Amino acid sequence: MTPRSICAVCCVLCCVLLLAACNEIPIEQSPIELPENVQSEQGSEQMPAPEQSTQKQTAGVTTSAPQTEAPKQTEAATTAPPATGEPTPASGIVTPGEKGYTYPEMEEDLAMLQETYGEHFTYESIGKSVDGREIYACVVGNPEAPRKIMITGGIHGREYLSSLVVMKQIEHYLSGYDTGSFGGMRYAQMLEDFAFIVLPMINPDGVMLALCGIESVQTPEVRQTLEKIFADNTREGLTSAEHINDYFAYNWKSNANGVDLNRNFALSNWVDVKTGILSPCFRNYKGPRAASEPETQAVSAYVQSLGEIEGMLAFHTAGQVVYWDCGVKGAVRQETFDLAQAVCEHTGYKFIYDEHLDASLNDWMTLDLGIPTVTVELASVIYPMPTSEFDAAWEQARELWVIAAQFFGE
């Protein structure tokens, strides 16, 4: 076995021991915490489809928006064979690490992908996090392509599985460039016609806190800030974790300032967004002002520099659901509905309408920039999420770039 394989086995054993010991730890944990947009599935509203329906060709199946109900769930398309010569989830460049998928592991993988597939892959830093880590953006495919699709992951710290899946998607399409295809679309043609703009880990500080705890902090000032947030959240009854690293592992979604980046984008009516949290916290604090955080500023500036973007798939965990709409009207609402429907039909995930405004990246891009976006919530287990969840999440998400390309290619 390679050292990384041995680390992966150790990680699984550690997760088993951790889960077995959870009954002894007085901290927040739930079998499935649905994404922050809703309190429970029962509290989510299924919204009737738009009155006018357009059709899109996705994975060889023509779909149309129903008039009165959400799309019927179909069996997830998870049995398609990998492209010839494609690495399996447990092999290749991008694989789960000892702790999950850390920022240094991502940096190492980005460098290896550049070295191996540099003809069709580039990456750059678009800014720095609170604790001084680079925020990377990748271009997969033809950088001069007339159409761009954005893929994002890792905006919430404890949702590091989303970064792993997004990075594996990059390798999947690059390694299968010459021989791979899905639903009648060749990867080579897809990557010639589209530039996929990928932000694999928007919140590197949050990911490192969730995986490696307070020891991952690089600067004394940031450590002092985080220790104060933990003390304040404990005093306010927002956490019952006895140790700060349990607090991070089970709870942490925010950046190193205690701001939830997916509540911090400069939505035109940001001041009206209510999250219920008024000070730095492990989640849902929207910050002192719109786009106050360096991560939010970097992503916003980069998105605006790209020009026209066809759409975005934002990967999160957990819940195995797809969120769409966020209250958008007109043609963008219809296109967002159809995109969400295509993703649901491929993955078998639940289709959820959500008009609640969060000042998320999706809200800002869809409502203010007019770009169709959907949120794909992978996996369905407690935090900290074991890497054993990766295989199932990967099978469901593997071909979603193709689904998006077929959708926007019509």
What is each PLM-predicted segment?
Residues 161, 168-325:
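Active-site/substrate-binding loop(s) of hydrolase catalytic cores
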Residues 82-131:
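Short glycine- and acidic-rich boundary segments immediately preceding or forming the N-terminal edge
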Residues 18-21:
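C-terminal motif of bacterial Sec signal peptides marking the signal peptidase cleavage site
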Residues 1-10:
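Bacterial N-terminal signal peptides that target proteins for export
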